[in-house]
Amino acid sequence: MLLLPPRPPHPRSSSPEAMDPPPPKAPPFPKAEGPSSTPSSAAGPRPPRLGRHLLIDANGVPYTYTVQLEEEPRGPPQREAPPGEPGPRKGYSCPECARVFASPLRLQSHRVSHSDLKPFTCGACGKAFKRSSHLSRHRATHRARAGPPHTCPLCPRRFQDAAELAQHVRLH
């Protein structure tokens, strides 16, 4: 069941004297200056969000009804700080260690450190890692023991990449 706001009774007479004047229109909110049309906290408080509904009364006469909508909070829910304590840090906190991160993606990346899953495995020695960047760093240790594979035919220098060797040979 839909409940509508009360509407004053519609006069039976259609004479101009008997009709109610139309409700005054709310002035439009000023647009924010600058490249963005969204108001910022530096420009002052935001105008209230209004929901306008076109309704029809019992006699079939349309009228508008305006309500102020509640602002939805942005970001994670905020906790209240005890008196005398600094306010809560804004962000997303880790449920394991309570570290706070600015974005949910950073939190998700951090939570890998608490898991026992190690999906990245070294093909040379079988050692496993939680992050691909750690595996890449580890692979360099295998290359360091063997030394760079590309040796200059004109001098004792060695290079990891064949393109670097070719550039070096041109300098001779």
From Swiss-Prot:
Protein's recorded name: Zinc finger protein 580
Superkingdom of the source species: Eukaryota
Subunit structure: Interacts with SMAD2.
A GO BP annotation: cellular response to hydrogen peroxide
Tissue specificity as recorded in UniProt: Expressed in endothelial cells.
UniProt crosslink position (Glycyl lysine isopeptide (Lys-Gly) (interchain with G-Cter in SUMO2)): K31, K118
Region (Disordered) residue spans: 1-93
Position of the signal peptide: none
